[in-house]
C-alpha cells in the first residue's frame, strides 16, 4: 500500500486529464473523550518495539538525508522536490520519520510524515510516505500516530489532511474523519505559462 494521501496536489494535472478538485479533507476526530495527554501516549507500537525490528524513531529533520527522502517520494509517485526548498519546508514542520538502523547509510528514511501549521491551533499533515519495500509493516501507522500525538501533546486541536479516496480508510483508522463542519479544501492553481509570465 502506498501512503500517498497526505501530499498537496495543488495545480497537479495527471497525464491525460485534468485532476479533479478538491481532494477530500479529513480532520482528526476531536470529539472523543480522551484528553490530549491520553492521545499523546496512544501508539500501537512502542519506540523500543520498533527498535527491536531495526527502525529508529526520529522527531527532527536533523540527520535526515533529504536526497534519500526525495528518492522515496519518487518511488511512491510523489513529485521530486528541489532539495533546498524541501529543507526549508522541513525547518518549519513537525517531522516524524523512521530510519532503518541496519542500513549502512545513515539518515535514510523508510517512513516519513510531517505537519505544518501555526504551532498553536492548526496543523495540516503532508508527505506521508513509506518506502515501497517496507509497506505493510505498520510503519505508516507508526509515524502518523507519533505525529498526531506530538501535535496533540503541544495543544494543537485542529489537525487536517487531504486524502486520496483510496487511502481514506487508513486515515479513518487513525481517528481522522471527513470534516464534520463540511468545510471544503480549495486549491489555488496557476498554469506553467502563467507562472512563467509572472516571473519574467
From Swiss-Prot:
Broad class of the protein's primary localization: cytoplasm
Gene3D superfamilies cross-referenced by the UniProt entry: 3.40.630.30
Temperature dependence: Optimum temperature is 45 degrees Celsius.
Gene responsible for this protein: SNAT2
Protein name: Serotonin N-acetyltransferase 2, chloroplastic
Source organism of the structure: Oryza sativa subsp. japonica (Rice)
EC number: 2.3.1.87
Function: Catalyzes the N-acetylation of serotonin into N-acetylserotonin, the penultimate step in the synthesis of melatonin. Catalyzes in vitro the N-acetylation of tryptamine to produce N-acetyltryptamine, 5-methoxytryptamine to produce melatonin and tyramine to produce N-acetyltyramine.
Subcellular location: Cytoplasm; Plastid, Chloroplast
Domain of life: Eukaryota
This protein's GO CC annotations: chloroplast; cytoplasm
Inducing factors: Down-regulated by cadmium.
Reactions catalysed: serotonin + acetyl-CoA = N-acetylserotonin + CoA + H(+); tyramine + acetyl-CoA = N-acetyltyramine + CoA + H(+); tryptamine + acetyl-CoA = N-acetyltryptamine + CoA + H(+); 5-methoxytryptamine + acetyl-CoA = melatonin + CoA + H(+)
Residues annotated as domain N-acetyltransferase: 55-195
Keywords, ordered alphabetically: Acyltransferase, Chloroplast, Cytoplasm, Melatonin biosynthesis, Plastid, Transferase, Transit peptide
Variation of activity with pH: Optimum pH is 8.8.
InterPro entries recorded: Acyl_CoA_acyltransferase, GNAT_dom, NSI-like
One Pfam family per UniProt: Acetyltransf_1
Amino acid at each position: 500500500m502506498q501512503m500517498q494521501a497526505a501530499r498537496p496536489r495543488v495545480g497537479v494535472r495527471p497525464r491525460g486529464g485534468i485532476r479533479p478538485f478538491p481532494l477530500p479533507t479529513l480532520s482528526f476526530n476531536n470529539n472523543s473523550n480522551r484528553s490530549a495527554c491520553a492521545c499523546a501516549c496512544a501508539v500501537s507500537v512502542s519506540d523500543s518495539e520498533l527498535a527491536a525490528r531495526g527502525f529508529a524513531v526520529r522527531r527532527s529533520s536533523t540527520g535526515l538525508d533529504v536526497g534519500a527522502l526525495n528518492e522515496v517520494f519518487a518511488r511512491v509517485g510523489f513529485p521530486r522536490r528541489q532539495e533546498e526548498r524541501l529543507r526549508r519546508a522541513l525547518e518549519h514542520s513537525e517531522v516524524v520519520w523512521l530510519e532503518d538502523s541496519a542500513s549502512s547509510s545513515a539518515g535514510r528514511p523508510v517512513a516519513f510524515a510531517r505537519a505544518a501549521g501555526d504551532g498553536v491551533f492548526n496543523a495540516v499533515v503532508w508527505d506521508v510516505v513509506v518506502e515501497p519495500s517496507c509497506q505493510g509493516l505498520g510503519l505508516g501507522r507508526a509515524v502518523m500516530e507519533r505525529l498526531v500525538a506530538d501535535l496533540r501533546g503541544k495543544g494543537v486541536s485542529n489537525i487536517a489532511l487531504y486524502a486520496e479516496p483510496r487511502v481514506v480508510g487508513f486515515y479513518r483508522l487513525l481517528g481522522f474523519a471527513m470534516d464534520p463542519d463540511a468545510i471544503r479544501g480549495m486549491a489555488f492553481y496557476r498554469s506553467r505559462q502563467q507562472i512563467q509570465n509572472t516571473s519574467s
